[in-house]
Amino acid sequence: MVSTRKEGASAGEPVTGARVLIVEGRYYEALADELLAGARAALEAAGATVDVITVPGALEIPIAAEIALEAAEEEDEPYEAVVALGCVIRGETYHFEIVAGESSRGLMDLALAHALPLGNGILTVETEAQAWERARVGEGNKGGGAAEAALSLVRLKRRGLK
């Protein structure tokens, strides 16, 4: 049997010249600051150029990303990847499920429709304490993790299946 498995590009390999869009929901501003710091550090360390746009919350992230992607294409300055950052903390109503599910679905639809490398750093947690455990730079920052996921996909896309 012939194997068609392709190994991904090495983590940490530079992505010089990659233009990456971060879309951050700022409903929880202090958490957003931490997630952004982690994502920006990971992207800049890899040699990517970073643009940031902000929206009120997680539910607005997918459409904001779509609008920005279209505008960048029209200006002939396309983005190679998107990193979504935000936080949804469960409350007493069904709103959590709607925001968490629909923001994730919207991002996945966007990524698949455009073959777009995307890192989803929208935290979906039960408590604010859980959010902080996942947001603090130096303590498992999921913003940096989402950026690394997007970078991994950029490397894979650049490499293709050669």
Swiss-Prot record:
It is an enzyme of class 2 (transferase). The active site is at 95 (proton donor). It catalyses: (2S)-2-hydroxy-3-oxobutyl phosphate + 5-amino-6-(D-ribitylamino)uracil = 6,7-dimethyl-8-(1-D-ribityl)lumazine + phosphate + 2 H2O + H(+). (2S)-2-hydroxy-3-oxobutyl phosphate binds at residues 92-93, 134. One of its GO terms (molecular function) is 6,7-dimethyl-8-ribityllumazine synthase activity. GO terms for cellular component: cytosol; riboflavin synthase complex. The keyword DNA damage does not apply. SUPFAM superfamilies: Lumazine synthase (SSF52121). 5-amino-6-(D-ribitylamino)uracil binds at residues 27, 58-60, 87-89, 120. It comes from the Bacteria. One of its GO terms (biological process) is riboflavin biosynthetic process. Keywords: Riboflavin biosynthesis, Transferase. Pathway: Cofactor biosynthesis; riboflavin biosynthesis; riboflavin from 2-hydroxy-3-oxobutyl phosphate and 5-amino-6-(D-ribitylamino)uracil: step 1/2. Its EC number is 2.5.1.78. The keyword Translocase does not apply. Belongs to the DMRL synthase family. Catalyzes the formation of 6,7-dimethyl-8-ribityllumazine by condensation of 5-amino-6-(D-ribitylamino)uracil with 3,4-dihydroxy-2-butanone 4-phosphate. This is the penultimate step in the biosynthesis of riboflavin. This is 6,7-dimethyl-8-ribityllumazine synthase.
